[in-house]
Each structure stands twice: as C-alpha cells, then as structure tokens.
UniProtKB/Swiss-Prot annotation:
It is found in: Nucleus, Nucleolus; Cytoplasm; Nucleus. Non-catalytic component of the RNA exosome complex which has 3'->5' exoribonuclease activity and participates in a multitude of cellular RNA processing and degradation events. In the nucleus, the RNA exosome complex is involved in proper maturation of stable RNA species such as rRNA, snRNA and snoRNA, in the elimination of RNA processing by-products and non-coding 'pervasive' transcripts, such as antisense RNA species and promoter-upstream transcripts (PROMPTs), and of mRNAs with processing defects, thereby limiting or excluding their export to the cytoplasm. This is Exosome complex exonuclease RRP42. The keyword Iron-sulfur does not apply. The gene is Exosc7. It comes from Mus musculus. GO terms for biological process: RNA catabolic process; RNA processing; rRNA processing. GO terms for molecular function: RNA binding. Keywords: Acetylation, Cytoplasm, Exosome, Nucleus, RNA-binding, rRNA processing. Belongs to the RNase PH family. One of its GO terms (cellular component) is cytosol. The modification N-acetylalanine is found at A2. It comes from the Eukaryota. Component of the RNA exosome core complex (Exo-9), composed of EXOSC1, EXOSC2, EXOSC3, EXOSC4, EXOSC5, EXOSC6, EXOSC7, EXOSC8 and EXOSC9; within the complex interacts with EXOSC2 and EXOSC4. The catalytically inactive RNA exosome core complex (Exo-9) associates with the catalytic subunit EXOSC10/RRP6. Exo-9 may associate with DIS3 to form the nucleolar exosome complex, or DIS3L to form the cytoplasmic exosome complex. Exo-9 is formed by a hexameric base ring consisting of the heterodimers EXOSC4-EXOSC9, EXOSC5-EXOSC8 and EXOSC6-EXOSC7, and a cap ring consisting of EXOSC1, EXOSC2 and EXOSC3.
Length: 291
C-alpha cells in the first residue's frame, strides 16, 4: 500500500489535532472528504464506475458472462473479483509490487459478498445446474491517496448499480434439449438490486481517538485500523483489523458504533447521487479523461 514519510513533529501535530476533533484538512473525526462518483464510464462493460475520494482514484468495470453454477449453489450465479494495482498509482506497485495488496483487497471483497443478503444471486441463475450469469468485477487502482478500501467499495456498489444484464429466455425443443435465446433489444435487460450491498467504513486509530477516511499522512500515524462492512440499514456484515497494532475491546465497540452511524449517511448520499445521475439520462455531461 502506498506510504508517506513523516517527521516526528508532523506526526505529533496530526495526533494532537485528532484529539481536538480538528484534522489537518479541517475535517472532524467522522467526516469524509468530497466523493466524486461517475457511472457508465467504460463502453465495453455491462456496468462501470469511477470514484475519486481525495487523491484516491478507483475505476471499476463489471462484465456479465454466462457460466455454470457452482455445485454447492446450483440455483445461483456468482461474482468474481480481480484487483489491478496500476504502477501509475505509486512507484511501489511497479513490477509485481502491487500483487499482495491486490490479493488482499480481492479477498476482502469476497468476504463482504459471501452472504445471501448483499446481492440476490438467485436472480443471476438462468437454468439451475446448467447456466448462470457470472459477474466479473475488475477493480483498477489509478491513484492512491489513502482510504483505499472505502473508495473501492463505493466504486463497486456504483458499478453494480450501473450494470445491465441481457434478458434471456430458455427454450426447450421436443426432445428436451434446452437452448438459450438472448433478447435483441439492448434496453431489454435486468438490473441488480444494490439496496443491501454494503460499503466499507475504515476507522484508523490515532492516539486515543479514531478517524474515518484517513489520508496517507493520517494512516502513517496509525498502527491499527478496523474495516467494517455496513449496509444501508446499519447492519455490520463483515469486520477485520489491519495494521501491526492492537485494539482494546472498548475501542472496537466505539469504532463499530461510529461505522454504523457514518455508514448510514454514506449510503443515503451515494444512493441519492446515483439516482440523480441516472435521471439525467444519456445527455448527462461527461467528465474526466474517460468521458
């Protein structure tokens, strides 16, 4: 993960500011930076989104392809995650430098979506035990400016919201052989419900307090962070600690309560933004180099 070198004086300045609920950039401990979200940015995908959170820039593309259901879940489709850490994001990712981080992020996403409530996987089933939709979710890290996991989870949810899956019909001939027919109408498609798709809220312990949406400088002052996956209703679906430091039970409880509080607000803002952007239709202004 991208890192930054700080002097002891800079670390003390950041820690003391957090103690007073006044961070270096003027935010409070539970405030996010400005989040920019744009969907439908990659033309050859079933759905896509780009998210900028401060200096963190994430691009997510979703590709729907037909596959075979897993043996243990014959009536469901499934999601596959791949994370690419671009060398443009930070020199540390050159060569195979970002492989470990990419694997860690992908495994975290698998844990978040490894339940029946996040996404209705049954809606991805075409023919039990034979055919289903497989959603390949590709995440590209364009720039790292702190708080990667939160930005990625927001981008994944936005991309799934934007995903259109072609409607299919299963036809059966007189001999019982099945044939799959895709609709010729590009607007005849199904969409996933993302209401229960969780977002990650990362809380970094700095001194005796914790902050959300930490910058690279703040992450350098933290020895332990808690990643909490929260739904729009404030339900925690996944939690893991990262970093070399430890967290006492009281801190974990406080951080979980903060994540629920912050997560609800984050979901409301994101859903409002996504619906507002969609209401603009194809005439909405394109921004960024992908526009």
């Amino acid at each position: 993960m991208a890192s930054v070198a700080l002097s002891e004086a800079e670390k003390v300045y950041i820690v003391h500011g957090v103690q007073e609920d006044l961070r270096v950039d003027g935010r409070g401990c539970e405030d996010y930076r400005c989040v920019e979200v744009e969907t439908d940015v990659v033309s050859n995908t079933s759905g896509s989104a780009r998210v900028k959170l401060g200096h963190t820039d994430i691009l997510v593309g979703v590709k729907a392809e037909m596959g075979t259901p897993k043996l243990e879940k014959p009536n469901e489709g499934y999601l596959e995650f791949f994370v690419d850490c671009s060398a443009n994001a930070t020199p540390e990712f050159e060569g195979r430098g970002g492989d470990d981080l990419g694997t860690e992020i992908a495994n975290t996403l698998y844990r978040i979506f490894n339940n029946k409530s996040s996404v209705d996987l049954r809606s991805l089933c075409i023919s039990p035990r034979e055919h289903c939709w497989v959603l390949y979710v590709d995440v590209l890290l364009l720039e790292c400016g702190g708080n990667l996991f939160d930005a990625i989870s927001i981008a994944v949810k936005a991309a799934l919201f934007n995903t259109r899956i072609p409607r299919v019909r299963v036809l059966e001939d007189e001999e019982g052989a099945k044939d799959i027919e895709l609709s010729d109408d590009p607007y005849d498609c199904i969409r996933l419900s993302v209401e229960n798709v969780p977002c990650i809220v990362t809380l970094c312990k700095i001194g005796c307090r914790h902050v959300v949406d930490a910058t690279l400088q703040e992450e350098a002052c933290s020895l332990a962070s808690l990643l909490v996956s929260v739904t729009s209703k404030g339900v925690v679906t996944c939690m893991r600690k990262v970093g070399k430091g430890s967290l006492d039970p009281e801190s974990i409880f406080e951080m979980m309560e903060s994540s629920k509080r912050v997560g609800k607000v984050l979901h409301v803002s994101l859903q409002s933004l996504l619906h507002k952007e969609e209401s603009l239709g194809p005439k909405r202004p394109r921004v960024g180099f992908l526009g």
